[in-house]
Regions:
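P-loop NTPase switch/communication element
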Residues: 1-18, 25-27, 119
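P-loop NTPase motor-domain active sites and their immediate coupling elements
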Residues: 24-231
Length: 231
């Protein structure tokens, strides 16, 4: 689904489709957020806008930092591969990244409790539910039923911060041809210039954290085998 945006000229890195590398990308985002807060502390500012304004005033445009939007198209794929790392990264970003100019959009077509965990949900206060198959799915997303009664085609329930109950609103239903025209327009504004250092970090994640990300129980299994003295 992100094949067209991949050429849109606005990406920091190519679209990441490998769940293992996506987990590493989230880890990079957490590290980037932490680094930005260090920059803010050094300059005695609180957020990205203040930092960038100061850098421009100091005639240091090369130190201006861009805003970053992190989009997870299917959370279930990541939670199958590295649930603990992904959950931790999402929670840290959701808690702290906004002031650093980093924003997180998480989507899934399988809103079960093992995908949208209680910890993730607690740290993402603003949520949207499109049409779902059951009241259970609606409650998993919004904490209330109702999304199972939506009509589709952009019909949604929006639960923003500060509202006691979800708002029913209509979002645009954009066809593939419309998407292609939008991407074509954005592409004409400039070609993508990827950050190779970020690409390299994602392509070769630290083995201590992600080298065996496909099996989180590897260490437990090794310990069990050593204890039983047989495999």
């Amino acid at each position: 689904e992100f094949a067209l945006p991949a050429i849109a000229g606005i990406l920091l890195v190519p679209v990441v489709t490998d769940p293992k590398k996506a987990a590493a990308a989230l880890n990079w985002a957490v590290n980037e957020m932490t680094q930005r807060y260090k920059f803010f502390a050094e300059e005695s500012v609180k957020d990205l806008d203040s930092y960038n304004e100061l850098m421009r005033a100091n005639q240091e445009p090369d130190k201006v930092l861009p805003k970053i939007v992190i989009i997870i198209d299917e959370l279930a794929d990541l939670m199958m591969v590295a649930p603990s790392q992904v959950e931790e990264s999402i929670c840290r970003l959701a808690q702290l990244a906004r002031a650093a100019g980093m924003h997180l959009i998480v989507a899934t077509q399988r809103p079960s409790v093992d995908v949208v965990t209680g910890l993730i949900k607690a740290n993402i206060p603003s949520r949207i539910a499109f049409s779902v198959s059951s009241q259970v799915d609606s409650r998993t997303i919004l904490d209330v039923g109702g999304a199972e009664k939506l009509l589709g085609k952009g019909d949604m329930l929006y639960s923003p911060v500060g509202e006691n109950k979800p708002l029913r609103i209509q979002g645009p239903y954009i066809s593939d041809s419309e998407t292609a025209r939008i991407i074509d327009f954005v592409k004409k504004q400039g070609e993508s210039t990827y950050d190779e250092s970020v690409v390299q970090t994602i392509e070769t994640p630290e083995k201590s954290q992600y080298g065996e990300v496909s099996d989180e129980l590897t260490e437990d299994a090794i310990a069990f085998i050593l204890k039983q003295k047989k495999a």
